[in-house]
Structures are given as C-alpha cells and as structure tokens.
Amino acid sequence: MAAMQMDPELAKRLFFEGATVVILNMPRGTEFGIDYNSWEVGPKFRGVKTIPPGIHFLHYSSVDKANPKEVGPRMGFFLSLHQRGLTVLRWSTLREEVDLSPAPESEVEAMRANLQELDQFLGPYPYATLKKWISLTNFISEATVEKLQPENRQICAFSDVLPVLSMKHTKDRMGQNLPRCGTECKSYQEGLARLPEMKPRAGTEIRFSELPTQMFPEGATPAEITKHSMDLSYALETVLNKQFPSSPQDVLGELQFAFVCFLLGNVYEAFEHWKRLLNLLCRSEAAMMKHHTLYINLISILYHQLGEIPADFFVDIVSQDNFLTSTLQVFFSSACSIAVDATLRKKAEKFQAHLTKKFRWDFAAEPEDCAPVVVELPEGIEMG
C-alpha cells in the first residue's frame, strides 16, 4: 500500500476516530482492496486503518503460488464499521479465502492494546475516493446488507454451484433427458442442452428481492393486462409492499447493492438484477406520481452509477440494442411530462440533457413502447 499525503492533524484524528480492519496471514501477492481502491499485498500487510465509519466493501483475489500471474476470481464481503471499531479477520489457507468468523473477544482486545505497534503494518484508507464511494452507496444501510448478502457473507464473482441431481446413475441422466456418458456430441447447441441443471450451493447466493414475471393481477381483463404491461406500476407496488413495506426508498439500497456487487465484485448475476430492477422502476409511470421523492433520488443514483461504466457497455452484442437508452427513453417520456412533480420533472430534464451531451444518446425519438403492444393472455381469457 502506498502511503498517502495527509495533514498530520487529520491523520492523528483519524487514527483515534476511524475504524480498523486487521487481516492476518493474507498471502503475499494477493490482490486486496477496499471500496474503490486495490493493491497487491506485500510482506508486511496486516490490514487497513483510519477507515471512515459506515458500509464498506472489501475484496480480494488469491494468486497461484506456482504462477503468481494466475489470479483467482474476485471475492468480497461487506462490513458495517463503527467509530473506533476494530475488526479482526484472518486468512484461511485451507479455503484460500478470508475467514469471516468473529475473532475471540480476548484476541480483539489484545490487538486493540497493541494498535500503536501494529500501526506500521496497516495501510491508511485512501480518502481521495471516499466521496465517490459514498455517492454509490448512500442508500445501502446495515439492514440492506444483512438482508441481501449471502448467508455465508462471501460475494463471489463465480457462483458456487452443484447439480440438482447427483448424476451418479444412468437413471438420473435419463430423468433430465441427458444422453449416456460417452455419447458423441454433434453440435454446440446439443452440448449446451446436455449440461445438467445446476443450483447455487446453499448459503452462497445473494438474496435479491424476487421480481414479478407477471405484471398484472390475477383475473385481469385483456384491457387491464395491456395497461399493466405498458405501465409497470402495479408490479412495482407489489414489490414495494412485499419487500419494503416500511420504507419504499429502501429499494434504492438494493439497486446500489446490486451495482456495487457487479462493479467491484464482478458478479454478473448482480448486473442482471440491477437491469431488471431499473427496468421496473423506469417503466412505472403512475408510481412516479406517488413516489416522486424516490424517483428524485433515483436520478441522483443513476447520475453517479453511469459515470462508472463506458457508454457502449449496455449495447447488446447481437442486436446492437442499448438497454439503457431504451429504458431511460421511457422513463424520460414519463418523468418530463407536465403531470409529475415539478422538482422531479426539472431534475429529469437536466439529467436527460446531461446524458445527451455526455454520451450522445438520443432520447428525442418516440419510444418503441408507445407502439401497439402484443401481450400474452392467460389461459381462459378471450378477447370479446
């Protein structure tokens, strides 16, 4: 960790007021980071000091001892740190990961008494990126982390999966319509079809809120189905009432949590959830009238998030469609209308102008969503 130039008085205050995370036995060469910063672990590394209280994301990638250039997949975990707090963790050589089991209180207190001697082995938190980190996580609370993080608390770039069936016997393979072992595969598609059904290992899956696949209520008429397929407010309200009954604003914490897991944790599933949740928020016109404060905050969140990703990242490789421009086009057509709250409308107009100038995205064309919508009717419902 490179030392940062910091005012001596500020450094002294942070030493006594900031939090400290000690990580023992982390192998030399490991890629280690906290929030927006990462380094290669040296022989003296024991952790990070002067960390501002709040939510932080620590991440790391182990390296192959035989070939140090081979870096493993990123893993990470969230910590809620308090003023003058001390967290003691250690590296598990067996599992090649940070053991998140709490250290004995006696060990923590002994470490606290020895902090000044340990100081030379602790890297200072880089305050240059603190504002950026806060802008990406200001709606993530300790409760958000507890609700969404996996039961084992480890955020893994690659899912730890197991086959739904053990596949030890031929009858198991037949149950999933898989050919006998050794049978020649004739195409790539056939190869994909042969892969067994997998499921995440228990306790390792990020516990995102379940988003509805049916956007309309049971027993809806064809006209209602069309309405709820164009304006997703019914589906959004279902999520808010079920998952965030006391505070609808907490959905923004989940949006930020998913983005951080993708951006810093390299979790692709988190990016997919972020897209689905954003799509639900942006296509809910009636909800904008009811939850205008939520949407004002959503614009601020998107302003900071979109500053971290290249403009062409959202373009589908196959279709060349840009998920974000099409989604935001619908959002702006609603948020910039005369019917919404004036503060929300002004902020949406400024944000639209900012994106048009920065990314050269065109929001002027009529959204495809304004075209006639073809919806699948549930069984038993016929057009009159």
Curated annotation (Swiss-Prot):
Coiled coil: none
GO cellular component, one term: spliceosomal complex
Pfam families per UniProt: AAR2, AAR2_1st
Keyword Acetylation: yes
Keywords: Acetylation, mRNA processing, mRNA splicing, Spliceosome
The protein's role, per its UniProt record: Component of the U5 snRNP complex that is required for spliceosome assembly and for pre-mRNA splicing.
Family: Belongs to the AAR2 family.
Name of the protein in question: Protein AAR2 homolog
Species the sequence originates in: Pongo abelii (Sumatran orangutan)
